[in-house]
Amino acid sequence: EIGYMFGQYKRLTNRYEAGVLTGKGLFYGGSLARKEATGYGNTYFTRAMLQTAGEDFDGKRVVVSGSGNVAIYTVEKVQEFGGKVVACSDSSGYVVDESGIDLALLKEIKEVRRGRLSEYAQIKGEKSGVYFVRSGDGSIWDVSCQVAMPSATQNELTGKDARQLIKNGVMAVGEGAN
């Protein structure tokens, strides 16, 4: 347990350093927005990058890899800023929803059911412009976007992926994965 480890750190070092461990309870200096922090923070940072070029998320096609906390809360904040997230992924593959990822459905599948993204495509149906691509049959970075936000695992973009993103017209990449 993180609280125990934090207590032992304090005992051994005789110092109170709230930033030494993540995931602590509020009593030990933890965050109220623990689940959201990385996704929100990366989205704010990426928005600031876009703004230095006179751009914003508004109306942009965005691809977010992953579907854990970082990705889900990246999707949430991008949508709040007016971007349209058209794809996200999990270890089984990626889903493309041309009308924009349905955040409520994504949260239901990943946070409540603990299901796979293939369920998203099954629920939405291919007639609605939603499709699922299994792992190994393509890369989420093949999906055309203006902003790419790797949020699944660190160092996931390869040179090949970067070249594909450039070919597809990406203007910004904001990596939230850690």
Residue spans for each PLM region:
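Short amphipathic alpha-helical segments, especially helix-boundary/capping motifs
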Residues: Y16-K24, M49, G159-L165
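Glycine-rich phosphate/diphosphate-binding loop of Rossmann-like nucleotide-binding domains
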Residues: K24-G25, G30-E36, Y40-W141
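A glycine- and small-aliphatic-rich helix-loop capping segment at beta-alpha/alpha-beta transitions
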Residues: G7-L12, Q79-K84, G169
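Charged/polar, solvent-exposed surface patches and flexible loops
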Residues: Y4-G7, E108-E111, Q164
